[in-house]
């Protein structure tokens, strides 16, 4: 892949081995003493990484984990802010997902970290404090958005496409303004999550579906350009093992003139094919459309 077209990333998931979930409501037994075994894990270092390599990690659940009693320690056994530990060990980007309203009518969180904008601001401030940039991942849903489900947020449920685009634009703009006002260093904004032919309740299988999906994407991009003009804009898909699908996504983004900088892809090796295929698929996108590509 062309050197000047690739954003080089390693995506990680921050996990706590003493937890079965990351919702604050799942932490009833956190104060009970647990037996933990210790062992050595060795990962061979990748040599000669370029200076612009993005070493990223999704840390969206950290506040919920900490509320459940989780603490973090460095290699010397000293308790520290986990974001300081990450920064000291080469992480330079923190990815945080944002759900519109991850709570039921009684104010109970859906779980998964209850990742609303306030959670993102808290994470962003701490990441920025330790010299890391934030990748803001808007799902435009009240809970997980993925290829199997792209549900419209409750507040937007009965909106037509024009009204929904305006709501998405305003929500994106207001959320980014909150991050900006808090002094967060936003380096990239992801418009949607794993938007494989669907986003925010719109489906490509419906007549005019891609036109509506890309209209929503452009509404989000407009807000980013206005509030965070220096941030990169990413559009995100999954299942790179389906090369024809990725080619189709690229064509639709180009045809409908979506304003974006980075074509981003999930990559789970168990499901998503070989690294060779991933490289070929993303290289084709970069070469065809002149976009940066990224795995996150």
Where are these regions (language model features)?
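Bacterial N-terminal signal peptides that target proteins for export
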Residues: 1-10
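C-terminal motif of bacterial Sec signal peptides marking the signal peptidase cleavage site
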Residues: 20-21
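N-terminal substrate-binding region of glycoside hydrolase catalytic domains
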Residues: 33-122, 126-128, 133, 141-167, ...
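Acidic (Asp/Glu)-rich catalytic clusters
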Residues: 46-51, 81-90, 122-130, 178-184, ...
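Structural preference for beta-strand elements that scaffold enzyme active sites
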Residues: 52-56, 92-95, 133-135, 185-190, ...
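Active-site beta-loop-alpha junctions enriched in small/polar residues
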Residues: 60-62, 99-101, 139-143, 191-196, ...
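Active-site cleft segment of glycoside hydrolase catalytic domains centered on the general acid/base Glu
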Residues: 109-110, 115-121, 145-251, 258-260, ...
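Active-site clefts of carbohydrate-active enzymes
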Residues: 200-201, 235, 265-268, 288-296
């Amino acid at each position: 892949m062309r050197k000047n077209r690739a954003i080089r990333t390693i995506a990680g998931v921050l996990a706590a081995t003493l937890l079965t979930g990351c919702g604050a409501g799942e932490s009833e037994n956190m104060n009970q003493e647990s037996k933990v075994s210790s062992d050595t894990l060795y990962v061979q270092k990748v040599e000669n990484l370029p200076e612009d390599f993005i070493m990223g990690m999704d840390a969206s659940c950290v506040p919920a984990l900490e509320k459940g009693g989780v603490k973090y320690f460095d290699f010397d056994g000293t308790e520290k802010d986990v974001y300081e530990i990450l920064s000291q060990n080469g992480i330079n980007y923190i990815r945080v997902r944002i759900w519109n309203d991850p709570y039921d009518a009684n104010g109970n969180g859906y779980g998964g970290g209850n990742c609303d904008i306030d959670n993102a601001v808290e994470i962003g401030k701490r990441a920025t404090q330790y010299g890391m940039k934030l990748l803001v991942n808007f799902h435009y849903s009240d809970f997980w958005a993925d290829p199997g489900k792209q549900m419209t947020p409750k507040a937007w449920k009965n909106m037509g496409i024009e009204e929904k685009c305006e709501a998405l634009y305003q929500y994106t703009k207001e959320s980014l303004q909150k991050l900006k006002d808090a002094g967060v260093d936003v380096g990239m904004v992801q418009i949607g999550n794993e938007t494989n032919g669907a986003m925010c309740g719109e489906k490509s299988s419906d007549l005019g579906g891609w036109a509506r999906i890309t209209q929503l994407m452009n509404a989000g991009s407009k807000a980013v350009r206005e509030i965070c003009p220096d941030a990169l804009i990413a559009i995100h898909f999954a299942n790179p093992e389906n090369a024809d699908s990725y080619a189709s996504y690229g064509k639709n983004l180009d045809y409908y003139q979506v304003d974006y900088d980075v074509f981003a892809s999930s990559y789970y090796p168990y499901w998503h094919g070989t690294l060779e295929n991933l490289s070929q698929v993303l290289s084709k996108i970069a070469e065809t459309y002149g976009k940066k590509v990224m795995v996150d």
